[in-house]
């Protein structure tokens, strides 16, 4: 028994522990419940009672030697890890935390939502991947309308039994879904991201944010529409802003108009931004076309309504005097940091 202890002591002394794997192997061989040291302790009961105290002391010393070797290895590995870790100079000044800010387009969209919800409008949303039934058909777009061409719309699939699938070109499909799901009176705004196959320039982009509004009730008139837009424009651009309504055409409204405000840069005198006109377009609007009402299951003889739509990003350009819409989508921190609160 004593010779076995001496042999095991020699094995422990000569065992090389160079990494965590070898340390684990050492523990499994010597110190676990079924290891070599535990095996010798199990044989202690077979030793003569006169020699048992002395052999027990030798076994305890053997166990302590193994545990000490483990502690030394773990301490060595910990010191090496500390030495390899990157040093930290606590005397250096700390880095200032970066103060983020809300994106200018999101600031404008948030203000738009607050203005219209204060007027009694609720917020409705819908899918960006849309069927042409909701994007075109129910909105009174004729089959040969240019907006249905590949040059203007991003089609995902065409010629499917359930209809063409596309990236919505406006948030008007949300209005259609609301009219199909709810009964009048209806008063909603529909903010969201839209997509158009347009050339990218300082004034246009292939993806942008839009907010549209819809109000349907009895005896709604164009005068109600003008009052709503005037109230919005004064809260959005200032009480001294001037507006003008120009006759226009949209398949889903009749009569239709486009709304301009005085140019933010020249104050109406004429400059390169407003193309010497003194005016900048902010939205399109009009009375909901009777065909749209019929397509959505609403009787146009009983109900009337108005709709409007505006580009959130273009409104942000107006408010913050940004001359290139591409800046809103490039995520250049040098530009965005100017809007830090």
UniProtKB/Swiss-Prot annotation:
Q: What class of enzyme is it?
A: ligase
What does it catalyze?
tRNA(Phe) + L-phenylalanine + ATP = L-phenylalanyl-tRNA(Phe) + AMP + diphosphate + H(+)
Superkingdom of the organism of origin: Bacteria
Kindly list the cysteine pairs connected by disulfide bridges: none
Q: What is the E.C. number? A: 6.1.1.20
The cofactors it requires, by name, are: Mg(2+)
The residues the record assigns to binding Mg(2+) are: 254
| Cellular component GO terms, alphabetical | cytoplasm
The places in or outside the cell where this protein is found are:
Cytoplasm
- List the InterPro entries: aa-tRNA-synth_II (IPR006195), aa-tRNA-synth_II/BPL/LPL (IPR045864), Phe-tRNA-synth_IIc_asu (IPR004529), Phe-tRNA_ligase_II_N (IPR004188), Phe_tRNA_ligase_alpha1_bac (IPR022911), Phenylalanyl-tRNA_Synthase (IPR002319), tRNA-bd_arm (IPR010978)
HAMAP family, from UniProt? Answer: Phe_tRNA_synth_alpha1 (MF_00281)
Q: Which NCBIfam families match?
A: pheS
What PANTHER family does this protein's entry cite? Answer: PHENYLALANINE--TRNA LIGASE, MITOCHONDRIAL (PTHR11538:SF41), PHENYLALANYL-TRNA SYNTHETASE (PTHR11538)
In Swiss-Prot or TrEMBL terms, this protein is called Phenylalanine--tRNA ligase alpha subunit
User: Which organism does this sequence originate in?
Assistant: Chlorobaculum parvum (strain DSM 263 / NCIMB 8327)
List the taxonomic lineage.
Bacteria, Pseudomonadati, Chlorobiota, Chlorobiia, Chlorobiales
